[in-house]
Swiss-Prot record:
Annotated protein name in UniProt: Succinate dehydrogenase [ubiquinone] cytochrome b small subunit, mitochondrial
Family classification: Belongs to the CybS family.
Membrane topology listed for this record: Multi-pass membrane protein
Membrane-crossing segments per the record: 64-85, 91-111, 121-142
Gene for this chain: Sdhd
Subcellular location: Mitochondrion inner membrane
Organism: Mus musculus (Mouse)
Amino acid sequence: MAVLLKLGVLCSGQGARALLLRSRVVRPAYVSAFLQDQPTQGRCGTQHIHLSPSHHSGSKAASLHWTSERVVSVLLLGLIPAGYLNPCSVVDYSLAAALTLHSHWGLGQVVTDYVHGDTLPKAARAGLLALSALTFAGLCYFNYHDVGICRAVAMLWKL
């Protein structure tokens, strides 16, 4: 019962305000330093709170890239059964483009996450771009001069 009474005092208008002002988390000095974008003294030294927005937070390019990755993934979910049910050159070339884009973006994230340094990431990205271009060219060549991706997979299943 005593706990409920203390909670009632804390949750009332003056009790909650007094609790917040006495708290180590929120103090008027911290609030004013936050509003002025000044460094404040923290537990482990000086902390600097930035009020300026990130240059990339409002970027439409990141949102568009994320959306296009999801569109290609959903497109692949539809193209794979379409290639099985109706193997034709349109589906073959669509699969070549979608598979190449999907693998390029996925491997690009691996390069971003695991390749560090000044020149090594640039070389890895250039190598990835060359690999993706060769993959697309190879799949298009296979579609044009041979049976195509869909029929090749069907022939492999018959083995």
